[in-house]
């Protein structure tokens, strides 16, 4: 699954592809897979734009930026729905809303057609993003990186949100310090095993060794006292990623 960037509050659409030899990129797209939307919170947006003396430059500014965009998207979708509800005769006399590609994507999220994948590290910010999602009635499919996901594992499970997490990578920036090696296992075992944990990597080498990454996460969970089978851990690199990509009806089991 390919996602665009993590420096913008709302980065753009993602796509699921098959690693097959094809003559065009479009022909590599996984059939009938939904698009996704990459969002990012925390240090990345506020650092990139703050260094340019632009907003957002704070975490509070990040939250304000999301809410402003979703308010615009709600208004855009309302205009579209109002126009589409008219009869063909009325449409000929009515003003057709001007198309906006950014708003098209956000409207797709509000309709439930596009899956939200959210780059986020800190527990309180993931909770903030969940609150914003509830305010504007959209669904977060997965938080990515989430080194503090273990702190809110039950909250993620309650809201049916997956955690796409590293097995043992942290400490490379301030918001990535408060990590535990049992992070994936804790998310998996939330609410009596109702959590959705994913072993992920955005590293070109690490992504080739997800089985080994899953083994490390499983070992950490066992050391922490969780009774997790190897079969259960396989879900972290098979069925759970397929669910998060919206293709579980075709692959992943």
Question: Which residue ranges define each predicted feature?
Answer:
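Short secondary-structure boundary/capping elements
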Residues: 97-101, 121-124, 148, 175-179, ...
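Polyanionic/metal-chelating signatures
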Residues: 1-142, 248
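Short acidic loop-to-helix transition motifs that present clustered carboxylates
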Residues: 123-125, 146-151, 239-242
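Short acidic active-site motifs
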Residues: 105, 125, 151-152, 183
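His/Asp/Glu-enriched, well-ordered alpha-helical/loop segment
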Residues: 115, 154-157, 161-253
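Distinct, well-ordered alpha-helical segments
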Residues: 126-134, 152-157, 214
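Generic beta-strand/beta-sheet core signal
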Residues: 3, 119-121, 143-146, 164-168, ...
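Positions that flank functional sites
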Residues: 7-8, 148, 171, 205
């Amino acid at each position: 699954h390919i996602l665009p960037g993590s420096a913008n509050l709302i980065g753009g659409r993602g796509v699921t592809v098959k690693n097959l030899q094809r003559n065009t990129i479009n022909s590599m797209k996984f059939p009938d897979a939904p698009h996704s939307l990459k969002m990012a919170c925390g240090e990345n947006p506020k650092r990139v734009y703050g260094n340019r003396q632009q907003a957002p430059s704070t975490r509070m500014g990040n939250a304000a930026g999301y809410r402003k965009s979703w308010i615009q998207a709600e208004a855009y979708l309302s205009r579209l729905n109002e126009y589409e509800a008219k009869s063909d005769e009325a449409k000929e006399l009515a003003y057709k809303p001007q198309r906006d590609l950014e708003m098209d994507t956000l409207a797709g999220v509000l309709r439930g057609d596009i899956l939200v994948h959210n780059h986020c590290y800190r527990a309180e910010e993931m909770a903030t993003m969940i609150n914003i999602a509830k305010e504007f009635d959209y669904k977060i499919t997965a938080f990515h990186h989430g080194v503090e996901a273990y702190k809110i594992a039950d909250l993620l499970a309650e809201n049916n949100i997956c955690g796409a997490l590293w097995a043992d990578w942290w400490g490379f920036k301030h918001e990535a310090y408060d990590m535990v090696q049992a992070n994936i296992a804790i998310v998996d075992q939330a609410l009596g095993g109702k959590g959705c944990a994913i072993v992920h990597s955005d590293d070109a080498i690490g992504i080739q060794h997800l089985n080994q990454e899953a083994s490390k996460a499983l070992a950490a969970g066992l050391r922490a006292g969780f009774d997790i089978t190897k079969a259960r851990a396989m879900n972290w690199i098979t069925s759970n990623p397929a669910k998060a990509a919206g293709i579980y009806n075709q692959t992943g089991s």
